[in-house]
């Protein structure tokens, strides 16, 4: 795969920023979560909690998450969503994110489109459409870190280094929502419902995740 000059420049810039962080950041403070994610609301708008999933101890150790939830929500029209929130006290020190592309559904699902989309409350998040045969899923994700809502992996890394240097902080969270488009349903309407859910999630997560 051929890399564009822009992408090469970004990667080199990230290396330079990382080097600067290592040179000038003497200490990075681990930032505890405000309150356990287990208290995350079980009702968000029209969506009601259905069940929760858990990682095995080895997976938790591998990820280095300080806290996480994986909740399924359903609504009256048969819609289904999975909300995953992971929190790290010091990304790259106590644990860290995997590439969001690795967190997308596998098992024969193929990426159909990727784009940044705005939220009505402000800010942008990533929207990915994946498909398998006649089925489609919508994946929304973003980084909610130190008071910012970030869609781009590159900008997340840049802010991570800058905040390590100037604030001695590397705490952050990765949030992902997966929804199954109902067969025969209105995909655009369903996506809008997911975006509304995401906007509410941003505001609710701020009650748990440390801000700026």
Residue spans for each PLM region:
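Short, solvent-exposed recognition patches
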Residues: 48-51, 56-165
């Amino acid at each position: 795969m051929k890399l564009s000059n822009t992408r090469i420049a970004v990667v080199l810039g990230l290396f330079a920023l990382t080097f600067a962080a290592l040179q000038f950041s003497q200490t990075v403070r681990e930032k505890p979560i405000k309150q356990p994610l287990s208290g995350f609301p079980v009702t968000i708008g029209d969506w009601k909690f259905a069940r929760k999933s858990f990682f095995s101890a080895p997976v938790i150790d591998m990820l280095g998450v300080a806290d996480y939830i994986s909740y399924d929500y359903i609504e009256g029209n048969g819609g289904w969503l999975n909300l995953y929130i992971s929190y790290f006290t010091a990304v790259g020190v106590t644990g860290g994110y995997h590439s969001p592309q690795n967190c997308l559904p596998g098992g024969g699902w193929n990426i159909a489109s990727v784009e940044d989309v705005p939220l009505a409350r402000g800010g942008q998040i990533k929207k990915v459409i994946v498909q398998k045969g006649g089925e489609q899923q919508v994946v929304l994700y973003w980084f909610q870190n130190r008071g910012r809502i970030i869609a781009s992996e590159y900008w997340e890394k840049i802010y991570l280094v800058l905040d390590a240097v100037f604030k001695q902080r590397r705490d952050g969270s990765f949030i992902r929502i997966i929804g199954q488009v109902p067969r025969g349903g209105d995909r655009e309407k369903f996506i809008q419902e997911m975006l509304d859910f995401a906007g509410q999630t941003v505001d609710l997560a701020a009650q748990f995740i440390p801000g700026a």
